[in-house]
Structures are given as C-alpha cells and as structure tokens.
Amino acid sequence: NEYWKKKIPKKIIGDIKQIDIYKNGRLQIIFRTEDKFYVLDRNGNEVKELSFEIDSGENNIPISIFDYEKNRNYRFLVTNDNIIEMFDSRGKKVSGFKPNTFESIIIKSPVHIRIDGKDFIIIQLENGELKILDRRGRDRIDIDEKIQFSENSIYSYMKTFTTTDNQGYLV
C-alpha cells in the first residue's frame, strides 16, 4: 500500500533519515538535494519553517546529523565542496559553530565521535588531510600525516579513531 508520494525537483543526496525534531514521538523525514535541506512530516508534507535553501557545490555529500547529548537537540552539518556549516533543528545557523572553508574538497559526511566526554567532528579531505574539530568548529587535534582514504568511514576504537586507507591498512 502506498501511503503517499511526493515529487522532489532535484536528486536526493545520501540516505533519507528519520528523526523526532518536535520531541513528540512522531518522526519527520530529512534529506538534502544539491540546493535544499528538506524536512517532511509523516504525511509527506514539507515542513516549510524547518526546510531551507543551501548553497550548492560540485561535490555535495550527505548531511550529518549530530545529537550531542542524546536529547533530540539535533545539529545538521551541511557540506558543499570544501565548506562546512552547522544548522540547528529550526533550520538556523548555529551561532557557536565556526563555519570552515578547507583547502581541499570534503569527501565524506562528517562523523561525530565522543571520547571521555569530549566531542570530535572528523572530516576527511580529498588531499588526504584528516581534520578533527571540536563541537564549535575549531581545530581540536592537528594531524600532519596524509591518508589516502578508502571508502570506509571513521570509527571510534579503544578511545581513539580508526579507518582504513586505500591499500586496506588500518590507520
């Protein structure tokens, strides 16, 4: 049975996610296209006050959703080419987050990892740089070594970070 369908004018980038923005037990659907962040209610209607236009780039990657305190105060990281911005669940830019423009294109959705109460936002760049930021967008750890990233994401492992390079080595 088809419950509803909706025509989206541009291709959806990444997975469609469900979250409870209103904290009422009813899930909303969120996703992005090259130039818009969408929030749809459970009936497929666009929640216009929460959907917003975003700058489009040539290398648009899926949004990242962070819920730092697990209290449904969501943060959305939107990237375009080499720029990263953070929005709150009302579609407003987070004033405490410093938008970043990197020297190279972002190649994967940013990842949030918490270790010993500290938040790390991890970003992989096309030039092999690994950027590790705090929750305000400032550099938390400087990494000098370049990595030829594989398709794998970055994970927390024994209070550190791990991924694989394109040769299959754990780094």
Report the location of each language-model feature:
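Extracytoplasmic/lumenal domain signature
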Residues: 1-171
